A protein has these predicted regions:
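Post-signal-peptide mature chains of secreted/extracellular proteins
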Residues: 1-131
Length: 131
């Protein structure tokens, strides 16, 4: 999905609305997303919220993925410290996306780290499952 400037986002409305993670999960399953793809979607959506505020990522796949987005500006900010500037909807979405991601990672037996995914994984999710 795109904003009014044509910028692509995997969870476009996460800034303005508390998104229903169960509805997103159902939608992803309806599009035949695998459990790993669903975990990847929630991982990407979490990091997308931080990226909007100029988070500096240390995971190479996130560095490359967000570096390819025209809207992203690396301001050198620690993703863990910028939470204070999130909108209330973003704070809720960040937490809710994290819980859902953790459920899937536990089910899959993988860590919840973005290091589980490549740039190609994130790009595939963005191109096929933008909500």
């Amino acid at each position: 999905n795109y904003d009014s400037y044509g910028n692509e986002f995997v969870a476009y409305d996460s800034r303005n609305y508390v998104m229903d993670v169960d509805a997103i999960e159902t939608w992803l399953k309806g599009k035949s997303a695998t459990d790993r793809e669903i975990a990847c979607w929630f991982t990407l959506a979490i990091n997308e919220i931080s990226a909007r505020y100029g988070a500096q990522f240390s995971t190479n796949s996130l560095v490359v993925y967000f570096g390819s987005k025209s809207w992203y500006q690396n301001l050198g900010d620690d993703p863990n410290k910028i939470r204070s500037v999130f909108t209330s909807a973003e704070k809720s979405n960040f937490d809710n996306f994290g819980r859902k991601r953790n459920q899937y990672c536990k089910k899959l037996g993988i860590s919840s780290s973005a290091k589980e995914y490549s740039y190609e994984d994130f790009n595939y999710i963005a191109n096929n499952f933008a909500y």
